[in-house]
């Protein structure tokens, strides 16, 4: 399995942390948004980070990737089966991807 993206990207780091919690090894290939890497573009034609490849399966978006990994490698389960608990996990994931990342970006990157 190959994870493409910028090492400092919170979305790349989310997938890497998720895989580590599951005990999975990912090959990491560093790419930037303007990188013409054809393997990255095959996973992410719109250059959305991270890109992910597992054999012939290719996809981008950190939430889609962790959902795939949890379904393919169910133990340990990191996304609950219970509908209410699953909904809470999806909510926290979306909250982290939008609100927390936006606030964190200002803290780390908008420094004068």
Task: For the regions a language model picked out, list residue spans one by one.
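GST-like domain detector, emphasizing the conserved glutathione-binding G-site
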Residues: 1-112
């Amino acid at each position: 399995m190959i994870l493409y993206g910028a090492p400092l990207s919170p979305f790349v780091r989310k997938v890497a942390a998720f895989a580590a919690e599951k005990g999975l090894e990912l090959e990491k290939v560093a790419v930037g948004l303007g990188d013409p890497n054809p393997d990255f573009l095959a996973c992410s034609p719109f250059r959305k980070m991270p890109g992910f490849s597992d054999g012939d399966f290719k996809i981008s978006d950190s939430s889609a990737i962790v959902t795939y990994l949890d379904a393919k490698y169910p133990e340990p389960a990191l996304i609950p089966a219970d509908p209410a608990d699953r909904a809470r996990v999806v909510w926290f994931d979306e909250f982290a991807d939008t609100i927390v990342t936006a606030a964190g970006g200002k803290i780390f990157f908008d420094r004068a």
